[in-house]
Amino acid sequence: GTTEQKERWLPALAGDDFPHLTAAWGESHWDFDPLNPRTLATVQGDNYVLNGHKAIVPLAEDADLILVYASEEGAPQVFLVEKGAPGLTVSPRERNMGLNALATYEVVLENCTVPLSAKLGGEQGADVKKLLAYSRVGLGGLSVGLARTAHAYAMNYAKERQAFGRPIAQFQSIAFMLAEMAWEVDAARLMVLEAAWNLDKGNDGLSQSALAKVYTDEMVLMVADRAVQILG
């Protein structure tokens, strides 16, 4: 962000009056390309005018600030859209197959007007590819944390649960599942660490972050499924 954007938002984000913040990235069409969103941003005088629909936006109804990803002259950019901005509408809560604990919404932008200063990074803009890489590493770390917790819970349960006079952890089928969960979690953890290390070193890191995100997505589903089986 620019110096002005940092002075405006960082003290609030680091203070007690933490504003609700969310990101409007996805769009509800089958060929959605995160680096070529259909939501458009055009310059009109001293403002940007945003038009488009964003889907699966978490906690949008309560957000004080929404980071809207939009295309400006064919390049992806990020815009800081504050709650109550003219032309910004948050639709009723979406009905999802999963993630019922996390409310998601559609965000509609109809000639939504924001000042030129609302463009993240100022006139030069932001490196959206790098932002995407950082977000993938963060989500990968989240998946690893969830999987480690599920594995630990299943392991403790298997050591305590008795069947036929011994803990079920001693049965080969259960032991194999616990072992597979352990190596998958550790492999995913190392992939996330490698991706994070590359980003910290200023390297490209795009391929590593993408690989880590894909692998951890598959891994956490497998580990959670095995944990449910072990718990009966």
Over which residues does each language-model region extend?
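N-terminal glycine-rich flavin-associated loop
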Residues: 1-5, 31-33
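Active-site-adjacent elements of ketosynthase-type condensing enzymes
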Residues: 29-40
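A short core secondary-structure module
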Residues: 53-90
